[in-house]
């Protein structure tokens, strides 16, 4: 898959019909039946959760490929504008949210996390490294970037190129393409590695007790990461740090976080065979309902404003962001305390490390 895409882009030929399949097509090609047709009751206890993660990986791949192809078209003709590039980047970013913050799963997928996105960026390392990169008189390749700092490889560097005032994209299209095409291809390559790593279920050998530990920690890790994306810019009351927000340049931090919450809810439900069903089967219907209701409340009251950076500039905006953080904190309590006690699970224990 990766070689086909790389050759396509480097040759600047129109191969969109071959490689830029719709997300569902790529998910089907990943192998097996679609989840709705599966009889999960007859499969390993982890299978439904595995399908959620595998689907997320292949949906990310589809968007990353599409982004690379749009960059190819942008650089090879006058048919597309920067708005098309921004839309493709944002779509890829939203798909990445479903896998962001993971500490459980295939090793080859987890090790690509920093390559996909460098965050938090406390010292604006991305800005400094990208400024140096685009000043070089060179058309970069994905291979070049893969040997360099993670700050110029992934989604954060693409955001800088598309939105930062110092980016050449505002006045020199050729210079922007010298790095943008390579970054897009590198993101597609890393996404391909992630999707490939999720081709096999990494949890099939776990017994029920170890699987419950792994599952709860998988969900917990992503929840804590999402909370960190809010707590860092919120900082101290009255003294926010808006530049610590994840996507402050594009002003899409809150859109990203909403996608995080939606992905966590999907992980919790897992096609009707996830943690929600486990709790109901144990007679903990009220607890299961409380978690679903907390997810729904969080999503239903999510701010319409996509920019945390903008909201933190006012007291009312700060209060609204803090209110959403508190909802996630309550969700954390339900999972870390109530669910963990019910399942006899220690949050933070890695079930794959052995007894």
Residue ranges and their predicted role:
Residues 12-14:
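C-terminal motif of bacterial Sec signal peptides marking the signal peptidase cleavage site
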Residues 22-355:
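Mature extracytoplasmic or organellar-lumen-exposed domains after removal of signal/transit peptides
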């Amino acid at each position: 898959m990766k070689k086909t895409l790389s050759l396509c882009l480097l040759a600047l030929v129109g191969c969109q019909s071959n490689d830029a399949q719709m997300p569902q097509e790529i998910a089907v090609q990943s192998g097996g039946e679609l989840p709705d047709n599966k009889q999960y009751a007859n499969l390993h206890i982890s299978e439904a959760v595995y399908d959620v993660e595998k689907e997320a990986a292949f949906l990310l791949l589809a968007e990353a490929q599409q982004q690379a192809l749009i960059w190819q078209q942008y650089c090879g003709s006058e048919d597309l504008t920067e708005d098309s590039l921004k839309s493709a980047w944002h779509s890829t970013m939203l798909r990445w949210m479903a896998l962001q913050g993971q500490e459980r799963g295939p090793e080859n997928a987890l090790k690509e996390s920093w390559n996909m996105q460098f965050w938090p960026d406390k010292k604006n390392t991305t800005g400094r490294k990208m400024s140096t990169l685009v000043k070089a008189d060179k058309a970069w390749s994905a291979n070049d970037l893969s040997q360099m700092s993670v700050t110029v490889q992934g989604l954060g560097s693409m955001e800088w190129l598309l939105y930062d005032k110092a980016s050449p994209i505002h006045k020199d299209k050729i210079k922007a393409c010298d790095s943008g095409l390579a970054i897009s291809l590198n993101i597609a390559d890393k996404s391909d590695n992630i999707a490939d790593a999720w081709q096999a279920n990494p949890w099939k050998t776990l017994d029920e007790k170890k699987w419950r530990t792994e599952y709860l920690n998988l969900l917990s890790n992503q929840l804590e990461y999402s909370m960190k994306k809010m707590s860092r810019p919120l900082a101290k009351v009255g003294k926010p740090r808006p530049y610590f927000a994840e996507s402050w340049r594009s002003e899409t931090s809150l859109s990203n976080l909403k996608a995080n919450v939606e992905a966590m809810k999907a992980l919790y439900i897992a096609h009707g065979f996830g943690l929600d069903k486990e709790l109901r089967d144990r007679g903990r219907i009220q607890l299961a309902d409380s978690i679903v209701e907390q997810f729904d409340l969080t999503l239903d009251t999510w701010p319409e404003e996509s920019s945390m950076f903008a909201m933190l500039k006012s007291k009312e905006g700060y209060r609204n962001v803090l209110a959403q953080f508190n909802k996630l904190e309550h969700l954390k309590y339900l999972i870390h305390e109530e669910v963990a006690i019910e399942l006899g699970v220690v949050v933070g224990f890695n079930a794959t490390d052995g007894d």
